[in-house]
Amino acid sequence: MSIDWNWGIFLQQAPFGNTTYLGWIWSGFQVTIALSICAWIIAFLVGSFFGILRTVPNRFLSGLGTLYVELFRNVPLIVQFFTWYLVIPELLPEKIGMWFKAELDPNIQFFLSSMLCLGLFTAARVCEQVRAAIQSLPRGQKNAALAMGLTLPQAYRYVLLPNAYRVIVPPMTSEMMNLVKNSAIASTIGLVDMAAQAGKLLDYSAHAWESFTAITLAYVLINAFIMLVMTLVERKVRLPGNMGGK
């Protein structure tokens, strides 16, 4: 099959917005980056919290962490997106729900719903990475910290977590890259990210190959940058003689 490529389409004036089609893609690129960064911050903080809970010697707290993981990990992500956008606002107190649905700009609604959904979904995966890393550490580290007079929270803060985070840099890199790719699902609830902009470009120009090739390359570049940065981080923080450190 012969494909008639026309990359000049990106420099043509878009039908609205006082910009070019390339401007549409660039706008979507910025939204994707902003969503990914905000969602990752939520995922890292919440995932670390529940990952710690899953390792503490308290059945209730450990069970709470397990419940969180099972809830978010076993429901399809696209279902969670629509739940956050359509269902959660209805469960909020009436004034807050009405403010979210009627007064907040729709684009902000889409962004907040997507950010919370993607962040909390990824947090369940981060939780398991943190749990596995803490449990992989020699038991003597925790015992030695407690023997030195540190409280359990202090042992986690000063001994266990610094070592655990060094161990999980590679799997955390994979989770960051997965988050960027999963962000494309946000377009299904109305967020105008790269995937949505490519769809618009296709609708108005009928250039499917160029539209989706462009955003494919954009996603590849984003994740290649993440891989490069995290590889440098891994080399910087790894411990000699520990988990492949040299």
From Swiss-Prot:
Molecular function as annotated in GO: transmembrane transporter activity
Membrane topology, Cytoplasmic segments: 54-73, 125-178, 233-246
Top-rank taxon: Bacteria
Record localization: Cell inner membrane
PROSITE patterns referenced in this protein's UniProt entry, alphabetically: ABC_TM1
Phenotype on disruption: Disruption confers resistance to cellular contact-dependent growth inhibition (CDI) CdiA of P.luminescens strain TTO1, but not to several other tested CdiA toxins.
GO BP term, example: L-aspartate import across plasma membrane
Entry keyword annotation includes Transport: yes
Periplasmic face of the membrane: 1-32, 95-103, 197-211
Example of a GO cellular component annotation carried by this entry: membrane
Primary subcellular site in the record, as a coarse category: membrane
Transmembrane segments: 33-53, 74-94, 104-124, 179-196, 212-232
The keyword Transmembrane helix belongs to this UniProt entry's keyword annotation: yes
Assigned keywords, A-Z: Amino-acid transport, Cell inner membrane, Cell membrane, Membrane, Transmembrane, Transmembrane helix, Transport
Record domain ABC transmembrane type-1: where: 29-230
InterPro entries xref list: AA_ABC_transptr_permease_3TM, ArtM/GltK/GlnP/TcyL/YhdX-like, MetI-like, MetI-like_sf
Signal peptide region: none
Any single Pfam family the record assigns to this protein: BPD_transp_1
PANTHER family in alphabetical order: GLUTAMATE_ASPARTATE IMPORT PERMEASE PROTEIN GLTJ, MEMBRANE COMPONENT OF AMINO ACID ABC TRANSPORTER
Subunit structure, interactors included: The complex is composed of two ATP-binding proteins (GltL), two transmembrane proteins (GltJ and GltK) and a solute-binding protein (GltI).
Task of the protein: Part of the ABC transporter complex GltIJKL involved in glutamate and aspartate uptake. Probably responsible for the translocation of the substrate across the membrane.
Entry's family note: Belongs to the binding-protein-dependent transport system permease family. HisMQ subfamily.
Official protein name in the record: Glutamate/aspartate import permease protein GltJ
